[in-house]
Amino acid sequence: MRPSKRRPDQLRSVQITRHYTRHAEGSVLIECGDTRIICTASVDEKVPLFLRGKGQGWLTAEYGMLPRSTNERMQREAAKGKQSGRTMEIQRLIGRALRSVMDLTKLGERTIQVDCDVIQADGGTRTASITGAFVAVHDAIGTLLRKQAIEATPITGHVAAVSVGVYEGVPMLDLDYLEDSRCDTDMNIVMTDDLGLVEMQGTAEGMPFSRNDLDMMLDLAQQGIRELIAAQKNALNR
Amino acid sequence: MRPSKRRPDQLRSVQITRHYTRHAEGSVLIECGDTRIICTASVDEKVPLFLRGKGQGWLTAEYGMLPRSTNERMQREAAKGKQSGRTMEIQRLIGRALRSVMDLTKLGERTIQVDCDVIQADGGTRTASITGAFVAVHDAIGTLLRKQAIEATPITGHVAAVSVGVYEGVPMLDLDYLEDSRCDTDMNIVMTDDLGLVEMQGTAEGMPFSRNDLDMMLDLAQQGIRELIAAQKNALNR
Amino acid sequence: MRPSKRRPDQLRSVQITRHYTRHAEGSVLIECGDTRIICTASVDEKVPLFLRGKGQGWLTAEYGMLPRSTNERMQREAAKGKQSGRTMEIQRLIGRALRSVMDLTKLGERTIQVDCDVIQADGGTRTASITGAFVAVHDAIGTLLRKQAIEATPITGHVAAVSVGVYEGVPMLDLDYLEDSRCDTDMNIVMTDDLGLVEMQGTAEGMPFSRNDLDMMLDLAQQGIRELIAAQKNALNR
Amino acid sequence: MRPSKRRPDQLRSVQITRHYTRHAEGSVLIECGDTRIICTASVDEKVPLFLRGKGQGWLTAEYGMLPRSTNERMQREAAKGKQSGRTMEIQRLIGRALRSVMDLTKLGERTIQVDCDVIQADGGTRTASITGAFVAVHDAIGTLLRKQAIEATPITGHVAAVSVGVYEGVPMLDLDYLEDSRCDTDMNIVMTDDLGLVEMQGTAEGMPFSRNDLDMMLDLAQQGIRELIAAQKNALNR
Amino acid sequence: MRPSKRRPDQLRSVQITRHYTRHAEGSVLIECGDTRIICTASVDEKVPLFLRGKGQGWLTAEYGMLPRSTNERMQREAAKGKQSGRTMEIQRLIGRALRSVMDLTKLGERTIQVDCDVIQADGGTRTASITGAFVAVHDAIGTLLRKQAIEATPITGHVAAVSVGVYEGVPMLDLDYLEDSRCDTDMNIVMTDDLGLVEMQGTAEGMPFSRNDLDMMLDLAQQGIRELIAAQKNALNR
Amino acid sequence: MRPSKRRPDQLRSVQITRHYTRHAEGSVLIECGDTRIICTASVDEKVPLFLRGKGQGWLTAEYGMLPRSTNERMQREAAKGKQSGRTMEIQRLIGRALRSVMDLTKLGERTIQVDCDVIQADGGTRTASITGAFVAVHDAIGTLLRKQAIEATPITGHVAAVSVGVYEGVPMLDLDYLEDSRCDTDMNIVMTDDLGLVEMQGTAEGMPFSRNDLDMMLDLAQQGIRELIAAQKNALNR
């Protein structure tokens, strides 16, 4: 049995709260078990230099953790004066994942700036960031549509992410911190609503994993993504 | 009448939620109107170099704003690679204010690290940080007392802070963002529960202010601080 | 009796030397007792981005200390690669204080860049910087008037600053380093020549201070500011 | 047909030159087609702080590109003052991949510091870095064994890496720059000599990829890794 | 006898390999004994701000060492986040030396960006960088001439550099690392092909040197420069 | 005739004021014509890591310019967050020059930290820094001798520095800013009182210089150094 007492294929409970803060065009609190992240999507009426004049938009993401979102207080990155490699890796992943369901030519010359800030961490912050940020982006696009700043939505489908892993030889879905820190393999999967693979990043922390392990993990991920996209749709319909 | 429709001497509604996040020894969400700040107090079992071996503790504070806590998205300080002068000024103020009610010799050689992170900003973030952080520190000290790491509380009294200002010639209590950006004088007052002055920082944004204005602002501040300390006590008794 | 042997209401001797260095439009050496600061005002024929095209000017200030201006050598901020929080706080204060007596719409689209560099420190460097920099700005404006770059002076009055404190229970004017490091309360007051309050920043280092202490400190400050503005006028008439 | 005229399952020609530079304990030039990388392994007789006193060793990696290793000159990271997110991501990957075949308890309290510096880039620099660095590490360990600094090798197997992708709908092995920049999916696979998966990082640049695509890519990768490990063994036997 | 067994006036063997890497307009590997440096010259179709619109070009240089190009691994400057004073000093020297034989008005509004990256160091890296970079610049200019981007070559002559020193009282040419670290005086000389002096930088590491020592060192340098320029010409004729 | 109306072999007037500021163990204002520099020498009772436990001392130097010491205001290096290549080059030169007349084994395990801060610049700031800093170091050593912290002076002789150049074909001594910016060759010479050469750094800004030019420049430098060392001795005898 896993430390969290969940079944191997059991997701943590997910809550997606829209309009969580007041200023952003899209603002979502996502809670996956004890992991809590504020995801905002801000509209910036310009594009980065490399896209200027090309008639298309951009989406980019930043990620941060409150210093005491974790069990041991981490040093504040703003005070240290630089973002860690882990932070950079995660924010690049979030950006790529969200762009995979955006037709940026329909956005016009503007940028959707996503911010994912972890209030409380219990594993899976990068995947929850993607799942939550999709809803925030959806709301920001909704604002643009209502203002008639764009004619059609650039969003081409849903995208969500979940972690899977091999814990004591058994493939498992949606690892919390304790499970993650003890597992042999840790993999993050990003999928669209038609179950196309957008990103997969797997690391064998201890033993290498086999292609059979991989298949079982992908089965679990597929099921988890389906539930997470259902939760996104649910939240967007409220 | 002021933009917020409040009376000149009327504080915004204050909510202090303890145990807001799970990991920190003290964790508080303070809400003053639309201003929402997470204040955590973490215990670090060492002191900075300049105090090592002196048999006393230390308390220090850091402050940050989520990029989209404000109306316009601000650049993330971690991404920019440095904290602004404003951030540094505020975190130094929070640290001094909280140390004013701490007998650090009773803390032992450990540091209370305070983090104030603004989730949503509507004026008065530095004063709300102080008011909320006091409660988080109180809870962190409580943890140390329960673990018998210290014998007696180092806390010597309550401390809270509030802003006052002169808006269209009339002194007013607890300015929100709109009031703050239009007022002539903006002053932040930090006081203890016996109404001793700990910090005062006043700036004439437009016209200089007179000693008479100052007196009226101090009267308002005194009343506001009383109410805020009552809210702190209330929260600590729950 | 105070360590400096001065009476509680006695300012240190003040010397203001204009045209101290050759290149700047305004260049002043101010000496307050053993505190010696070079204040220069440079004219830059452009404004920061946020003011471009608005038909008004700007004034900004920077502050630094020579590494061995103090008793213990401080690390050079340029070598460390960042300015301390204290430095940032002081230079923001100097800028605000000087802007309080400038009608920036009369300056045209140019910036007055003030630099205050402490050659020797003995307490009160931020207040002496303000008092000295005012004269440097006055000279820089004089250059612009003589060149007919502007038609009328943007300067609307004098501004000067002084510290006050409570030392062993007695309010005192213009603390030197020794007095400052032992006092209970330390307050910096910035006033105009009609004794309007522009900035006040008070900190209780030990015991909180009362409103009665505050009143006595303000009386002292008022008297000190009057003498400092007389010294400015004296220097400007030479 | 692919731009490089290779068959879909055809690796670029691989050259591994040992003892390429004189100072490092292990120094390898790896050439995969036009991609050329110097990989060195240096022995440092201490471990990072977090491992001090734990009786085990560490392996860490850094990665860089000469500014004109690419078609367009890139800004020198040392001059810019920071490493890009891409650089950090790659060097973290190289370190994890190499540690997967190291029993660090057999290394003693020392660190193997790997440096991978790209002299000329034509796609696949991160995977070639891993393949080449393994040989450099092997040589550095050889030095320690010959000096009898360690008793048994900490190396538990071979590790190598290769890229695979989907180019115009067809899965392909070992993409060069041109192929990489036009392909729909780009995946980097790290495997051991018993074909255990150590890392997989796949990104759909255009269309999401299916599990069937993934299977075909893994088949290709498996074959490529076999050939690369044969090349490593070949080089180590010379 | 000197540690390297060479005669006092004997240069190390020099190899200049053109077209060493594929992307740069000029790319040279220079080997002086065990010192090996990749020198590239890249053409950038713009000039720095201070030259914009002046109808002339610019040439600038950067210098770096691979972390393990030296006997002890050096910290990577990109990871440290800043270039050392030594690095800055060397790259400024390389730029000045190369500009001394360039008529920048004939280059048009473009910049030649030189990069000198030390693959293996054994003394004399800054002088070998200059000698090698000249050839790379020559090739980059050749590219511009062939493309008819410029009409006439901006190159006005050859430039090369060599070190001389006083080792155990005897002036010697072209010091390797061992000789350099033990010598009393270390001097770098940059000369044109008509033996005009462009740069000389001499440092007495131990005893000061006399004008007689200086004369003997200059005689040696003159001879060395002649041989190095012959090697440049040789390489350019191949 | 030269712009400054001086004869080719005429030094600017030199003033060396000791005890210029109060806190440093040695504090000197040196004025060479309009160039004015504060040179302080501070005693630090420890040595850098690389010398710890070796029973010898160290001397190091830092250099800075006040932002408006020059005709155009320069950006403050502390605000920019890094020192320029020029600054680093100069402070390394000052350190080497002063160490050339120090027997560091007689200093004990302490560091002399030299700071040269340019108050007003008119050419020759690096050479004046060396000449002035020698006197400050002499005073700091005097303090150590008086306190009997050391038994014998580590100072082995005088050191001073001067610039020479070729201006319109004529070698000249001690260039001011105007002369320096128009001259063909600019050379800085550091010599001891027995006229041993410690450093020479010459750059042909326009035409290369000949060995004959060099000889004439060295004759001028020799004479200038003699006068500067006489001024140092004079100041030290007052």
Swiss-Prot record, chains A, B, C, D, E, F:
GO terms for molecular function: 3'-5'-RNA exonuclease activity; tRNA binding; tRNA nucleotidyltransferase activity. The keyword Kinase does not apply. Phosphate binds at residues 86, 124-126. The keyword Cytoplasm does not apply. The lineage of its organism: Bacteria, Pseudomonadati, Pseudomonadota, Betaproteobacteria, Nitrosomonadales. It catalyses: tRNA(n+1) + phosphate = tRNA(n) + a ribonucleoside 5'-diphosphate. Homohexameric ring arranged as a trimer of dimers. It comes from the Bacteria. This is Ribonuclease PH. Keywords: Nucleotidyltransferase, RNA-binding, rRNA processing, Transferase, tRNA processing, tRNA-binding. Gene3D superfamilies: GHMP Kinase, N-terminal domain. GO terms for biological process: rRNA catabolic process; rRNA processing; tRNA processing. Phosphorolytic 3'-5' exoribonuclease that plays an important role in tRNA 3'-end maturation. Removes nucleotide residues following the 3'-CCA terminus of tRNAs; can also add nucleotides to the ends of RNA molecules by using nucleoside diphosphates as substrates, but this may not be physiologically important. Probably plays a role in initiation of 16S rRNA degradation (leading to ribosome degradation) during starvation. HAMAP family: RNase_PH. InterPro entries: ExoRNase_PH_dom1, ExoRNase_PH_dom2, ExoRNase_PH_dom2_sf, PNPase/RNase_PH_dom_sf, Ribosomal_Su5_D2-typ_SF, RNase_PH, RNase_PH_bac-type, RNase_PH_CS. It holds the Pfam family RNase_PH_C. Belongs to the RNase PH family. Its EC number is 2.7.7.56. CDD domains: RNase_PH_bact.
